[in-house]
Amino acid sequence: MSIFNHTPKNNYMICENDENTPSIMPLFTEISGQNDSECKTLNTKGLPILALRNMVLFPGVAIPVNVGRTKSLQLIKDAQNSHTPIGVVCQRDAAVEDPGKDDLYEVGVIGEIIKILEMPDESTTVILQGKMKRFRIDEITETFPYMRANVSLENEILPDANDKEFEALVSALKDLTFELLKNIGEQAKELVFAIRNIDSAHYLVNFLGANIPLSATQKQELLTISNIKERLFKLYEMLTQEAQLLQIKADIQSKTREDLNQQQREHFLQQQIRTIQEELGGNMQD
C-alpha cells in the first residue's frame, strides 16, 4: 500500500506502513511559507492532542500512523472534517492506553490530517503532516471525548546564512549517514536519493531525525532542541555513536570468525596427528 496519495512539491516515497514500528521511514515534504502563516493564526487554546506510541513527528515530515484507540479515532475524524490542525506528541510509555499529561513528552509538533485510510484488515491508518511549528504543552483542558490542551508555540532558531561551521557539519552529517546506510539494502537507495535532493539543511535535520532508526527517546531529544545548529550537532553525535557501535559489533564478529577458524584448523590438525599416530602404531604392530 502506498502511504501517500497527496502529492505536494518535492516529496519522496520511502517505504510502506508498519503498525507501531518506530523505524517507519516517512514521506518528506518541503513546506511553503503558507504553512508558517497558518501556524501564526492557530488557536493555541484547547488544541486537540494526538498521542503517538514509539513515534515522533518532525516539522516538514509526513508519517503514516496506525490508529486504534477510540479517542484517537474520534480526534482524527473530527480534525479532518473541520480541517483543524492538531497537536502531535509522543507518549513516554507506549504501554499506557489512556495517557494523561504526565505520560506525554512536553514538546510536540503541530500536525495536519492529510488522509485517513481504512485498511483491508479493518484497521485505520492516518497520514500526518508536520507543520513548521513545535509547541509545548502548558495545561490539559479536556480529556473527553479526547485530550485538548493549551499550548505555547516554539520557534526554530536557524543558523546564520554564512555559518561555515554549520555548512561543514551538514556535509559531514550526510557523509556519515551514507556510510551508515550502506548495509540496509534497497530502502537505503531510496533514502540516499531523497537526502541528495534535499537542499535545505533545516529540512535535512528533520528528515534524518524521522528516518534514521533511533529510539523514540533519542528522536524526542532532537525535537526538543530549538536551535537547528545544536539539533544538528546532537544528531551527528548520535549517529557517530551508532557508527562506533556498529564498528565494535563488526570487530567482534570478525574476531569470532577468526577464533572459530583457528579452532577449526587446530581441530583438523589434531585429527590428522591422531590418524598418523594410529597408522604408525598399526605399522609397528605389523
Regions found by a protein language model. Give the residues of each.
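N-terminal low-complexity, acidic/polar interaction/targeting segments
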Residues: 1-286
